């Protein structure tokens, strides 16, 4: 009789107090799993000499030692079971004396309490290992004259097994199943996987059946996983006797692969269906188009409520303001939206914008004011260390110290004015040659204008760009009569009560103006018109309707006075060069030579 033997086995257990359970009658519907492979021709049980589990697993003290299968056949010596389960079944089938057998004739010795013959029509393959794509583990060589013990299917190696309430419900369910009819179906074999890791013992945790896998607990540290081909037996509730047992669907491949579910396919703005991300956030096509149109048209919305309107699939079109604010709140990026000039040019940006970002008058005025404040000394940082109010007048000629002080004040102011000019919007976009030409041509005018605006002519105080404060008498010998003209201009400028924004625009107009030798005069003219428009709007807003034109004309009338004072300053530098007491700095000498009107 051919036999199939598990890889490890021990002698059959001796009769004991559990023998009376072996005659427990079983129902024909297989309420308990039975796979009886014994036949009337089976030889008497013979002991085996195979090693037990305790030989291979340290600390194992359980009684689960054998897993036996037996098929009826002719009286032949036990064949070696070194091949896989599929090859063993085929060899048994080709035996000349083998006959067809029924599934009821199978018997499994081990822990597998569950119906096996009812839903055989759901078997997906002839072998459970073929279904899961893993080969069966090869059993160990057989032992001659080994016979399986005649035990009850529910009398396992762990002692008497009393079904739990769950399996009592399973018994009631299996009794209602129709009996199998028709031709006998070949059984599905099992695939034994090696121990995977520690797990609680069978006595501590009940046996659980999963959709396609049943786990037999062998001990506190060992377990075997038995793959089955009955996915239709997957429980749909914590109890196996639930009403949906037979109708439990086989999980689809998408569900088994962990496909995204829940809110991952919902629009982050309104909750509608969303297939992919738009502008950095998963949104629906409606919210994507709404956000795109709003950004491209630079639309401005107004909420008629309290700016907290609900935005969902049904009410998303009620308040455009709240919908756009929610688009921004969930993380949609406005900079990603292509403008009208970029339509059809996916992935490409213009090399240089046609218009600087600070094109609006409000932004331009803010930038001019910020540049002016950053370039001037604060009141708290004024330097009075050299200030002397009582100074005896010197009627003689100037000495070298006075001339050196004059040159130092000019060169120090030039660096401050250069940094201020670089912060004017649009000035950095000009060519380097035009930038240098505008700075050198307007330097003396800017020096006079800024000094006159900061100084206090009533007190005779002159406040320079570095924060140094000097009295008028301290500058008389170095500046000559030019200092008196500067103070007179300062008094007239203060009489106009010019605020900081208007003065910032006026200073920029002194720098950005037409000069002889410009490479790009058109760009300079465009920038000048923008600054003039900004100044006009500011004066109109501050002065009011009755007299905006007169205020603007009086303010612009100071520009010709600056040209006259600039010529007077060039004459003073020319006079000091002739005296040759101190050589002028190279930058001052260059400015003097380039600015001469002749």
From Swiss-Prot:
PROSITE patterns in alphabetical order: NR_LBD (PS51843), NUCLEAR_REC_DBD_1 (PS00031), NUCLEAR_REC_DBD_2 (PS51030)
Ranges of Low complexity composition bias in the record: 37-50, 134-145
Main location: cytoplasm
GO CC entries: chromatin; cytosol; mitochondrion; nucleus; transcription regulator complex
Keyword terms of this UniProt record: Acetylation, Cytoplasm, DNA-binding, Inflammatory response, Metal-binding, Mitochondrion, Nucleus, Phosphoprotein, Receptor, Transcription, Transcription regulation, Zinc, Zinc-finger
UniProt-listed Pfam families: Hormone_recep, zf-C4
Signal sequence region: none
Domain NR LBD: 360-595
Stretches for region Binds lipopolysaccharide: 521-544
SUPFAM superfamilies tied to this protein: Glucocorticoid receptor-like (DNA-binding domain), Nuclear receptor ligand-binding domain
DNA-binding region of this protein: 264-339
Details of cofactor binding: Binds 2 zinc ions.
Key word Magnesium present: no
Region entry AF-2, spans: 584-595
Region (Required for nuclear import): 171-466
Sequence segments annotated as region (Required for the interaction with RXRA): 299-361
Cofactor(s) demanded: Zn(2+)
Function: Orphan nuclear receptor. Binds the NGFI-B response element (NBRE) 5'-AAAGGTCA-3'. Binds 9-cis-retinoic acid outside of its ligand-binding (NR LBD) domain. Participates in energy homeostasis by sequestrating the kinase STK11 in the nucleus, thereby attenuating cytoplasmic AMPK activation. Regulates the inflammatory response in macrophages by regulating metabolic adaptations during inflammation, including repressing the transcription of genes involved in the citric acid cycle (TCA). Inhibits NF-kappa-B signaling by binding to low-affinity NF-kappa-B binding sites, such as at the IL2 promoter.
Domain notes: The NR LBD domain binds the lipid A moiety of lipopolysaccharide (LPS) in the cytosol.
Protein name: Nuclear receptor subfamily 4 group A member 1
């Amino acid at each position: 009789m051919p036999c199939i033997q598990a890889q490890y086995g021990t002698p059959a257990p001796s009769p004991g107090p559990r023998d009376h359970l072996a005659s427990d009658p079983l129902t024909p519907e297989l309420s308990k799993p039975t796979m009886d492979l014994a036949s009337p021709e089976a030889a008497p049980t013979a002991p085996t000499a195979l090693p037990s589990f305790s030989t291979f697993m340290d600390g194992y003290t359980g009684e689960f030692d054998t897993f036996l299968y037996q098929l009826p056949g002719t009286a032949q010596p036990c064949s070696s079971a070194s091949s896989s389960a599929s090859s063993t079944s085929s060899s048994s089938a080709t035996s000349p004396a083998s006959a067809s057998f029924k599934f009821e004739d199978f018997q499994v010795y081990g822990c597998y309490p569950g119906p096996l013959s009812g839903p055989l029509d759901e078997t997906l393959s002839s072998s459970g290992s073929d279904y899961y794509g893993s080969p069966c583990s090869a059993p160990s060589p057989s032992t001659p004259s080994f016979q399986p013990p005649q035990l009850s299917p529910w009398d396992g190696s762990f002692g008497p097994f009393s079904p739990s309430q769950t399996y009592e419900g399973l018994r009631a369910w299996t009794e209602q199943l129709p009996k199998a009819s028709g031709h006998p179906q070949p059984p599905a074999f099992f695939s034994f996987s090696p121990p995977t890791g520690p797990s609680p013992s069978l006595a501590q945790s009940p046996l659980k059946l999963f959709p396609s896998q049943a786990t037999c607990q062998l001990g506190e540290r060992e377990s075997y996983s038995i793959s089955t081909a009955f996915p239709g037996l997957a429980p749909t509730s914590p109890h196996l006797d639930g009403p949906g047992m037979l109708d439990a669907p086989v999980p689809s491949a998408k569900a088994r692969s962990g496909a995204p579910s829940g809110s991952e396919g919902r629009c982050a703005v309104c909750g509608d269906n969303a297939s992919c991300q738009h502008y950095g956030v998963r949104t629906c096509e409606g919210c994507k188009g709404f956000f795109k149109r709003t950004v491209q048209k630079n639309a401005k919305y107004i909420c008629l409520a309290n700016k907290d309107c609900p935005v969902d699939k049904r009410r998303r079109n009620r308040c455009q303001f709240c919908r756009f604010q929610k688009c921004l709140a969930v993380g949609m990026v406005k900079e990603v939206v292509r403008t009208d000039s970029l339509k059809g040019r996916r992935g490409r940006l213009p090399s240089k914008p046609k218009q600087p970002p600070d094109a609006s008058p409000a932004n331009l005025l803010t930038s001019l004011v910020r540049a002016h404040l950053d370039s001037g000394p604060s009141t708290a940082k004024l330097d009075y260390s050299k200030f002397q109010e009582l100074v005896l007048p010197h009627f003689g000629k100037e000495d070298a110290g006075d001339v050196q002080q004059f040159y130092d004040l000019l060169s120090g102011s030039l660096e401050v004015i250069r940094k201020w000019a670089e912060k004017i919007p649009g000035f950095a976009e000009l060519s380097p040659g035009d930038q240098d030409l505008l700075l050198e041509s307007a330097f003396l005018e800017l020096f006079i204008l800024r000094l006159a605006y900061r100084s206090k002519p009533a007190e005779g105080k002159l406040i320079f760009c570095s924060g140094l404060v000097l009295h008028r008498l301290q500058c008389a010998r170095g500046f000559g009569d030019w200092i008196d003209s500067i103070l007179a201009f300062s008094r007239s400028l203060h009489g106009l009560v010019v605020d900081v924004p208007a003065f910032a625009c006026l200073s920029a107009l002194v720098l950005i103006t037409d000069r002889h030798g410009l490479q790009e005069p058109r760009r300079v003219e465009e920038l000048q018109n923008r600054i003039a428009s900004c100044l006009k709007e500011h004066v109109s807003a501050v002065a009011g309707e009755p007299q905006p034109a007169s205020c603007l004309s009086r303010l612009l009338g100071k520009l010709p006075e600056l040209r006259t004072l600039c010529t007077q300053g060039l004459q003073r530098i020319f006079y000091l060069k002739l005296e040759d007491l101190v050589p002028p700095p190279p930058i001052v000498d260059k400015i003097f030579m380039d600015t001469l009107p002749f």
